[in-house]
Amino acid sequence: MNNQLVPQNAAAAAAAAAAAAAAAAANSLKSRKPYTISKQRENWTDEEHQKFLEALTLFDRDWKKIESFVGSKTVIQIRSHAQKYFIKVQKNNTGERIPPPRPKRKSIQPYPQKQKHDGMGAFIPDSLSGNHFISSSSFATWMTYRGLMPNISESQINPSDLQKQLEQLQQAQQYIQQAVTTAQSSQRNGGLPPNPSSNNGGTTLTPNFPKIYAFLSNLFESNGTSFTEALSDLSMIDRETMQILMHNLAINLANQQYRDNHQTLSEQYRMKRDEDEDLNAIMISPRNSTGNINVSGDFYDNNSNNNNNNNNNNNNNNNNNNNNNNNNNNNNNNNNNNNNNNNNNNNNNNNNNNGGDFGDQNHSNMVNLGNYYNNHPNQNTINALYSLNQPSTLSNNPLNMVGNLNPQKQPPFNLNLNMQSGF
C-alpha cells in the first residue's frame, strides 16, 4: 500500500514543479509592444506604382534599392504596398512575377541570386556609364521583362553552346565599344565616324545617314512590309551604324530621364495643338473686317424678281408718259422737244447714278422698294430699311451693324427683320 502511494506523490510533485517553472518563465518574458501607426497612410499614384513594379523586377526584395529607385516612399510604406500587391496577385492569379521571399538569417539555403551578365557593361556608352539604373547587373533582366531581349532558361542551353555564345558576345562587345568610342571622338572633333574595318587601305568610309534613317522609319511603321530587301541594299558600314543606333535607342528607352522628357514634350505638344485649334476656330468664324457677322443679302435676292417687275412697270409708265407728251406736244417748237429730251437724259443719268457700286442691282432695287412702299402702314420699318443706303442717316440708324461705312462699297447683308403684312 505504501509502495503504491510513493509513485503517485512523485508524479504530482513533478507536475507541480513543471507548472511553477512555466509560470516563472512566462513572468520573465517581456510583453510585446502594441502596434501603432506612426505615420498616416498615403495613397500611391500610378506613376509611383509603375516605378515600384520596375524596381521590383530589377532589385527583387532589396527594399533599400527600391526606396532609392521610387524616391517618394519610405521602406515601411514600400514593404506594406508590396505585401498587399503580392496578396492581390496570388488571389487574382494574374501571372505577375513575385520575387522569392528572403531567407531567415540562420537559414541554410542562401538567397537565390540573379544570373549576372558580365558583358552588359561594355555596351554602355561613356555618357551613360554613371547611370546606376543602366550600369546595374539587373539591366538585362529588365530588358527581358520588357520584351527587348529573349527570355531563355538555363535548361534550354548546353554548356558548350553557352561558352560559344559568351565568346561571340565578348567579341561583339569589344567591337561595339570601339565603334561607340570612335563615334564619340569624331563627334567631338566635328567629323564623321570612320569605318573600323578599313584599316588596310587607310581610307575612311562615311555612313549614309539619310538612307539609314529612312530604313529605320520604315521599320517602325505599323503597316510596313518586309524589310529584308531594303536591308540587303545597305552597305556594311550602314548596317553597323544602324546596329549602334538601335542599341542606343534601347538604352534611351530604358532611361527614366528620357521617359520624363518625352512625357513633358508630349504635354507641351498637346497644349500647343489645342491653342492652334482655338486660334483657327476664331479665324474661320464668319465675321467681316469690323468684327461683326457678315452674312449674305438673302432678303434682296428673294425680292429681286418683284423689284425687277416694279422697275419694268415704272419704265413702261415713263415710256407711256413720254409718248403721250410727245403726241400732245407735236405742235410745239423743236427747242422744247430738245429740252425735254435733255431733261429725260438727265433724269436717266441721275437714276443710274443712284445705283453706284452697291451690290449692282441691289441698291436700285432698294430705292424702288422705298418709293413703292412709301405709303405702306409699316412706315417706320420701311424708312429704317431704306435709310441703310443713305450716307447721311447711316450712323444714326439703330439697325446699323457695321458702323460708318461707305454705302457704295458695303456688300449686302441679311437683316433678318420680322417683316409684317405687305412683304
UniProtKB/Swiss-Prot annotation:
DNA-binding region(s) from the entry: 63-86
Major place of residence: nucleus
Keyword Magnesium: no
GO molecular function: DNA binding
Biased composition (Low complexity): 177-202, 302-354
PROSITE patterns, alphabetized: HTH_MYB (PS51294)
Record domain HTH myb-type: where: 36-90
Keywords, alphabetical: DNA-binding, Nucleus, Transcription, Transcription regulation
Compositional bias segments (type: Polar residues): 286-295, 361-372
Region of interest: Disordered: 93-116, 177-205, 284-372
Disulfides per UniProt: none
An example Gene Ontology biological process: regulation of gene expression
Places the protein is found: Nucleus
Protein name per its UniProtKB record: Myb-like protein G
